[in-house]
A protein has these predicted regions:
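Short conserved active-site loop signatures built around small residues
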Residues: 103
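Cofactor-centric catalytic regions
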Residues: 1-95, 108-221
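Phosphate-handling active-site elements
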Residues: 96-100
Length: 221
């Protein structure tokens, strides 16, 4: 463990239970005489690996609402075949309540990308993923704030649905006020009429290095 760190949670027991089920551990352990001079036995190996270097690694993410209602996400983590572009887009889509196709992920350009320590140390899904979550939460607040201006109401009267922002309590028809505004309209009006692009940048670092766990079983003869 780094810096005397104590693991606050562990699912190693679930890994072991699953691998025992997959290999038929209870029927085969510790060994089985095949009756032909051969014996079969089973064994289990377990491992853990920290996620990022605690108190050292940092990840940053920028997400922007475009004038067409789609999102642009700029990251500093390089996709070296690990699929992190897809993984981080999935995280953002979950947070923003939208489809993955609504998010365009831009590859790394160290001249302009937000800073990231790098795609190493099993850190991207955990560290950069949490930076995505923080960025999405900040961006949603900005979207709601801008929608409140357009709908002439308080921010606490609105909710973000993913495709639009709407009033929690609808106003009567004929009142002269709208009950809902689409994300496309928000992005378009913010960028084209207010000279303002809705975007957010957040960073994430971790005081701990939470480890994923694994268990594997083998049968030998």
């Amino acid at each position: 463990a780094y810096y005397g760190e104590t693991a606050e949670s562990c699912t190693l027991d679930r890994c072991v239970d699953r691998v025992k089920e997959m290999i038929g551990w209870d029927e085969k352990y510790p060994r089985k005489d095949m009756g032909n001079g051969k014996v079969r036995g089973v064994g289990i190996a377990m491992a853990m690996q920290g996620s990022s270097i605690s108190k050292v690694d940092v990840a940053s993410v920028t997400i922007k609402v475009n004038d067409d209602g789609f999102y642009s996400m700029t990251i500093g983590a390089s996709d070296m075949g690990t699929g992190c572009d897809t993984t981080l887009a999935q995280v953002a889509a979950e947070c923003l309540n939208c489809e993955m196709d609504d998010i365009v992920v831009y590859g790394v350009d160290t001249d302009i990308s937000p800073y990231d320590s790098g795609s190493y140390a099993s850190s991207t899904a955990y560290l950069t993923g949490n930076a995505v979550v923080k960025t999405c939460e900040t961006l949603k607040k900005k979207i709601i704030k801008k929608a409140a201006e357009y709908l002439s109401c308080g921010e606490d009267e609105l909710e973000f649905t993913g495709k639009s922002v709407k009033r929690l309590t609808p106003v009567p028809e004929g009142s002269g006020f709208e009950n809902e505004i689409s994300l496309l309209d928000i992005g378009n009006r913010a960028m084209c009429f207010n000279n303002e692009a809705l975007q957010a940048t957040e960073s994430c670092t971790s005081p701990v290095s939470p480890p994923p766990f694994m268990a594997g079983a083998a049968e030998v003869e």
